[in-house]
Amino acid sequence: MADRQRDPDLADTLLLLEHPPVYTLGRGSSLDFIKFTPPASFTAGVTPSSRAEPTPPQPGPELHRTERGGEVTYHCPGQLVGYPILNLRRLSADLHWYLRQLEEYLIRVLDHYGLRGERI
């Protein structure tokens, strides 16, 4: 990753991997979406909202705040996750254009395997 920052002309890469059980919380997330009590170290400085009764922290998946948009995402073994790593400026400066292209490509791949994909 550091090499890519130094040289944006490196070839595009796709990372495919499985995560251990983990919840990631995007910028739009709230701890109200978590159905278990996170460890105190995770909630330090967070004002509780509508939780009626706090319960003791329970062992469970890891929690990580991220800089992505959206709310809460759960990743676990058996779930294949893909991370395209590329220089969008080389393709188009518009992130939404790229996402529509990626979406169309995945819909076509699904169709090739007899599965129906659609835009939401």
Curated annotation (Swiss-Prot):
Entry similarity comment: Belongs to the LipB family.
Domain BPL/LPL catalytic per the UniProt entry, residue ranges: 8-120
The protein's annotated pathway: Protein modification; protein lipoylation via endogenous pathway; protein N(6)-(lipoyl)lysine from octanoyl-[acyl-carrier-protein]: step 1/2
Annotated source species: Prochlorothrix hollandica
Keyword field contains Membrane: no
PANTHER family to which the protein is assigned, alphabetical: LIPOYLTRANSFERASE 2, MITOCHONDRIAL-RELATED, OCTANOYLTRANSFERASE
Subcellular location: Cytoplasm
GO molecular function: lipoyl(octanoyl) transferase activity
Binding site for substrate: R68, G69, G70, E71, V72, T73, Y74, H75
Catalytic activity as recorded in UniProt: octanoyl-[ACP] + L-lysyl-[protein] = N(6)-octanoyl-L-lysyl-[protein] + holo-[ACP] + H(+)
Catalytic activity, EC: 2.3.1.181
Any one GO biological process: protein modification process
Official protein name in the record: Octanoyltransferase
General remark: In the reaction, the free carboxyl group of octanoic acid is attached via an amide linkage to the epsilon-amino group of a specific lysine residue of lipoyl domains of lipoate-dependent enzymes.
SUPFAM superfamilies for this protein: Class II aaRS and biotin synthetases
Function: Catalyzes the transfer of endogenously produced octanoic acid from octanoyl-acyl-carrier-protein onto the lipoyl domains of lipoate-dependent enzymes. Lipoyl-ACP can also act as a substrate although octanoyl-ACP is likely to be the physiological substrate.
Protein keywords: Acyltransferase, Cytoplasm, Transferase
InterPro entries named among the record's database cross-references: aa-tRNA-synth_II/BPL/LPL, BPL_LPL_catalytic, Octanoyltransferase, Octanoyltransferase_CS
